[in-house]
Amino acid sequence: MQEVVFDMEVFPEWWCMVYTDPDDMTEKRVITSDTPNYLMKIKKLIPARCLIGFNIKGYDLRILNGIIHNCDPYRLYELSKAIVETDDQTDPFNNYTFWNKFNFCDLYDDWRFGSLKEFESNIGMSIRESEISFDKCNLTDDEKEEIIRYCKHDVEATVKMLEFRREYIDSKIMLSEMFDIPLSTALKSTNAKLCALVLEAEPKKRTLDTKFVIPKKVEKYLRENLPENVISLFEYLNDDSKVVNLFDNEITFGIGGIHSTYSENIVTKSDDKYVLMNIDVTSYYPNLMMKFNYLSRNVAKPEKYEEIYNLRVELKKQANEEAKINGKSEKWKRLNAQQNALKLILNTTYGATKNKYNALYDEYQASSLCYLGQMLLAALANKIYTRIGATIIQTNTDGILIKVERNRLDNVRVLVKEWEDLTGFTMEEDFIVMFFQTIQKCGSKAKITVHKRFFIFRSVHTG
């Protein structure tokens, strides 16, 4: 499917659409309300092509839908105002009625790095703003040319973002191929929606059970290594943050995971006697779903998730072997693209399980997974602290950073191995040269910004 990057600008008496040539993305084409037979040209452009832009679901595709329904410039201007200024949902075009009329991919989906202008700034591109009011009537030819230049600049920026996010697009294409999902559907979907499609999730309504049940196989370990006042915090599922002091850390347990620090401001490094050791759980949330049955109950065949996990491991292994023998060959590119696509599914499932608008939504499973994950890490950290005397520098969602005497490293590994055997998880260890962290608190209601750095000099896999 050919890709066409486009952008639209709307004024009371005139509109323009700038788009890339379907055969040469470096060339820009322009259609305006002044263009003879503009509707025919737009209708000829659309079929069998994927329209790509930034936040086009929220704006440009709604405008384009208005155009193909013969809206005149002023009607489009009213629609533009309804979208941008008033959020008027009564406008019949300010909605998703365009969805099945176009093939498209919105680069705003799953994007976490700000606006298109911020992207332009981050890549060193000049930022162009139009000084012409969007409410201006009677545009001169010079003003129209200026608007077109501005629009072309945004299209060029979007082309660069497309290059930057090529792997994102390619993963959707690959998942479409691997799981027999229509390409147009895959490209339109967010990662979370695509994940639900791959796993064939069917939404179900359930009464939320707020009682958290500790799995039997780890209950004894948790009760032995966490004090009762910590265990009791997890009796009922809720979104409240829970702050406690344990292993000389201030710990925050929250729905986003565990976070703790030894000190707000710290600089520490490895030396001849002590070493900084970081231990992380491999694919923590995916493994919690598989080994403790925390996958969304909306998935009819839970084994499919584990099959995807195992297939990804095998494809990654094959890709690494191919790279060693033949470098980044065409075979390697395909294997790597396949494993990256499957990684997207594995890493997106948990977040989708928390999204009430997603077919995977299962609040009980998502919250239970998060609770158990935090408790298991806290219990391991506390056991290392109490048994070995190591300093716990920090904990995070899937790992623990400790400072320990070098001659006690094997003692730490024994406790890690015990934890791995109990849970079925695997931990990876890294040795850190230096770690420093500062926490800035701003205002009376402290907004905390954490700055931290660490330097790794070698990595070893355990387990």
Annotated model-derived regions:
Residues 3-5, 12-29, 122:
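RNase H-like nuclease fold core
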Residues 26-463:
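Conserved acidic
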Residues 1-3, 14, 48, 273-274:
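Short, surface-exposed beta-edge/turn micro-motifs
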Residues 1-10, 105-106, 277-279:
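Two-metal-ion RNase H-like nuclease active-site motif
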